[in-house]
Structures are given as C-alpha cells and as structure tokens.
Amino acid sequence: MATALITGGTSGIGAEFARQLAARGDDLVLVARNPDRLAEFATELKERYGVAVETISADLGVREEVLPVAARVASREQPVDLLVNNAGFGLSTRLTAEDTTPLEYGVEVMIRAVLILGAAAGRAMRSRDHGAIINVSSTAGFVTMGRYSAIKAWVTTYSESLAGELGAGGVTVTALCPGYVRTQFHQRASIRTGSIPGPMWVDRDKVVTEALADVAKGKILSIPTRRFKVMIFAARHFPRSAVRAVSRRMASGRH
C-alpha cells in the first residue's frame, strides 16, 4: 500500500489530493499548521475511506519545523511514495512594499520548504528507484504578475531541474500549474476576482484528477484543462514584452 505525504493537506487543493488518494487506498501523512483541523480531517478520512492517516503540525515558514517533516519524508522504515508539496497562500503585498515580511514568509513556505522537502524525497526515492514528487506551482509562474508569479516561476523551474537531476529512472517530478481554482485561496489573500470570467475557473477535483493522471504518465508539467494549456503555450512563445504588458493589465484589476 502506498503512502502519500501532503503539505497544506487540510484545505483547498491539498485536501482534495488527500480525498482522492485516500479513495484509491493510499495511506496519508498530512502536514498543516492547525492541529485541531488536522485531527478533525484525519478522523473524517479514516472513517470514510478506511486508510491510515498520520498528522504532523508544522509551520513550514520556520526552518526548524520543516526539518522533522523532511525526516519523515526520508524515513526508510516508513517510506513515502508520493510527496505533494502543496502548502502555500496568495500574496497581496507589493514587491516595493516597505515591509517585506509577508513576501519573505512566502519565500520560506513556498520556496525554502519545497527545496528542503524535495531534496529529502529525491534522495530517499532515488535510493529505492521509486516514487513521485508533485510540486504545486501555478500558471501565474508563466506570467509576470508580481510576487506570486516570481515564487511560482521558481517552483516550476525547480521541478524541471529536479526531474533532470533524478534522471529517467523510477522517480518522477511533476509541477502542477493550475489556473484559477475554486477554493478560499483568493479571498484569504484579499485578491479581487470579480473581473475573472466564470469559464476561467476550474473545480479543484478536476485539477487533482488531471494531476494524478499526468503523474502516472510521468509528465513533468501538468496544466489542467485545454484552455490553460493554450494560454501557457502562448505565454511561453509570445514575446516577453507582450507577456509583461498583458500581465500588467491583468494585475491592475485585482488590487
């Protein structure tokens, strides 16, 4: 029976990963900050799906709290077959803000923790020649809409680089790059979404279903829905000056 470790595993895309993986019989290790929510969700999953659910309460913005999670990822006695680096949040602080503390915390959670856990998983999985890593990135990483785009551009490039380092063996790395997903993500970051057309939104169950299918195929980039595949193809091939101009217009309507 496989075991999956999911960071940010009690809400949004992370919770959907937990549900779909539990439904197929995988045991889970859930990582999140709120111990009460972890315990509640773990009980729900165990009762509904009959799988084992381990919980780790950790703030991934604190390096000392990331390291025990990395140790669990690297365990030989209880191997992790799938790492889902999902923990993250929206950022409304501008890059030119006088107080960059929120941006620094975003880097700590969505870059440093991803790097530490990805390294631990990569070593452990390579030693067994088996395993998969999903790093939840974003279509925002292909455009230039400020702080979140910058962080997610790193996540995507890092995932491609890690896949290259691990080679063509039994370990895969996938950067999941969803577009606008129906969760509480934008509201929590106070990001206005009224200007985003309804057809641009994607349900999180569809995002996760497509991601797991892409992982099974060994894909390095997973971009859910044909609409966003076309958009990202354009973003990667249009002149960067055009991408920046469009990004500025998109960003101006969200603050």
Indicate residue ranges for each PLM-predicted region:
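Conserved glycine-rich Rossmann-like NAD(P)H-binding loop of the short-chain dehydrogenase/reductase
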Residues: 24-41
